[in-house]
Swiss-Prot record:
Location (main, coarse): membrane
Name of the protein this chain belongs to: 56 kDa type-specific antigen
Membrane topology, as annotated: Multi-pass membrane protein
Signal peptide positions (record): 1-22
Segments traversing the membrane: 64-86, 469-484
Length: 521
């Protein structure tokens, strides 16, 4: 029997009621005391999926398949055997090759695993339509209200559309209200939007009492009615303020546009900056971001101009101007914040005017191009299939040769279609607790549980990301073997679970296995 001697002097110093007699454990029990461990670790990613949608999915819900890498790395730990068979440790693990490739060339059900007829039937699919960002109605400032009240009518004897064009445009851009709407009684006609009659106009409690009756009709050329409508719209817009800042709304809007056009920009070698506007963006940063967006959209349009008829002809011109109230703001923090919000709101309104600034037409043209390219590819595949059928008269050898050629081309296409979606590194620190389940000779089977933090950095879509820190938990089941006096070999397998997502896209869970040497001091 092995004895661990408890020194009498130490016990006396601690005033503990123990004698100097030895405490005896079974020969195969693990010794109490501190230990250190070093080892290697490897695993397989689990639960993570591509953030890219499969363009072949008409519902726009299916994600492209991922080819996941096998993470590997090293682990270091320091711990304490608390009682025989129970130990606690602090461990650090560094994982490399946390990566995955997306199969751009393989569209799920497009795989040629069926008959020729099946392959031909699945060639033409309905593509998800590109949809421009929806307009955002922003609160109207007092300065914008005062400017709008004084919008004049155009001189002359023209119709309302011409004389009140500036006022009609203000209603659309600032309030999202169309001045004219289709006439329900006459499909070919149009009437003044009845919503304009429901907007509070003027003082609801004028002197003398009795209230104020709503007008029977709205005349946009009438300056008094126009002033009252502008004041009413301003009050309503500020009563329904969004919960997020104008800068955040603008940043999200630009990010959505960039995400929509990115495939086309990549083909045209147009660089897209995926850095969002910070919440504290200055007026100059907002102006530069809008100018950058205008340049990117115009570069994409020019790149495809002439590829198909009657498309990409309307230039993209974002009519963004810094509001006059912003230009006169001081440098005080409160004034700077007001200027920031006003500039962001003006930029949002410039993007809202998609009919005139060219954004809506660009989306239509890109969708037309997408369908045109898909149709050409489908026709080529269909022609290849028809060529196979016609070649059957020439004998089996010709069919086999053509089939081999098609298979070889498919392999090449598949290789070209792979792109690294993310390539990350993870540093994981955990506090773990292990307990032996049972012991046989010099072997013991143990289970463990752990919790801690994971620090992740690297690249997503080829761009460096901001380092992410999140909570993780783990479970493990393993075997420990006593290979020498005080030296043990641990081999275990388990599951690492992440409680948060990186970039709000990827949840890095993994099945992991490790092997290490543990030395008891």
């Amino acid at each position: 029997m092995r004895k661990i001697m408890l020194i009498a002097s130490a016990m006396s110093a601690l005033s503990l009621p123990f004698s100097a007699n030895a405490i005896e454990f079974d020969e195969n029990s693990l010794e109490c005391g501190p230990y250190a461990k070093v080892g290697i670790v490897g695993g397989v990613l689990s639960g993570v999926e591509s953030a890219r949608l499969d363009p072949a999915d008409s519902e726009g819900k299916k994600h492209l398949p991922l080819i996941k890498g096998m993470p590997f790395g090293v682990t270091l730990a320091a711990g304490m055997t608390i009682t025989p068979g129970v130990r606690a440790e602090i461990s650090a693990m560094y994982l490399m090759n946390v990566k995955a490739e997306v199969e751009l060339g393989k569209m799920g059900s497009d795989a040629n695993t069926g008959t020729t007829a099946d392959a031909s039937a699945g060639v033409i699919r309905k593509h998800k339509k590109l949809t421009p960002p929806q307009p955002n109605i922003m609160p109207i400032s007092i300065a914008d209200r005062d400017i709008a009240v004084d919008i004049p009518n155009a001189a002359g004897q023209g119709n309302v559309d011409v004389r009140a064009a500036a006022r009609i445009a203000w209603l659309k851009n600032y309030a999202g209200i169309d001045y004219y709407v289709p006439d329900s009684n006459n499909p070919q006609g149009r009437v003044v939007n009845p919503v304009l009659l429901n907007i509070p106009q003027g003082n609801p409690n004028p002197a003398g009492g009795g209230g104020r009756a709503a007008p029977a009709a709205f005349d946009i050329l009438d300056h008094a009615q126009w002033r009252d409508v502008v004041v009413g719209i301003t009050a309503l817009s500020n009563a329904n303020k969004p919960n997020v800042s104008a800068v955040k709304i603008l940043s999200d809007k630009i990010s959505q546009i960039y995400a929509d056009i990115k495939p086309f920009a990549n083909v045209a070698s147009v660089q897209i900056s995926e850095t969002p506007l910070p919440d504290s963006a200055s007026v100059d940063q907002i102006q530069n971001k809008v100018q950058e967006l205008n340049k990117v959209l115009e570069d994409v349009r020019e790149s495809f101009d002439g590829f198909i008829l009657n498309a990409f002809a309307q230039p993209v011109r974002l009519n963004f101007q810094i509001p006059q109230v912003v230009q006169g703001q001081g440098q005080q923090p409160q004034a700077a914040a007001t200027a920031q919000e006003a500039a962001a709101a003006a930029a949002i309104r410039a993007l809202n005017d998609g009919e005139n600034n060219g954004i809506i037409q660009l989306y239509k043209d890109l969708y037309k191009l997408q369908r045109n390219v898909a149709l050409k590819k489908s026709m080529k595949q269909l022609g290849d299939e028809l060529g196979v059928d016609q070649g059957q008269e020439g004998g089996c050898s010709k069919d086999k040769k053509q089939s081999d050629t098609t298979a070889e081309e498919s392999k090449k296409e598949g290789k070209k279609g792979k792109e690294i979606e993310f390539d990350l590194h993870m540093a994981v620190g955990q506090v773990k607790l292990y307990a032996d389940l049972f012991t046989i000779d010099s072997f013991s089977v143990y289970a463990g549980i752990g919790a801690g933090l994971a620090y992740t950095h690297g690249k997503i879509d080829g761009k460096d990301i901001k380092a992410h820190t999140g909570m993780v938990g783990s479970l493990a089941l393993g075997v420990a073997a006593n290979v020498a006096d005080g030296v043990y070999m641990d081999v275990d397998a388990g599951y690492l679970y992440s409680f948060s997502k990186i970039e709000e896209k990827y949840q890095m869970n993994a099945f992991v296995a490790s092997a290490g040497i543990r030395y008891n001091f």
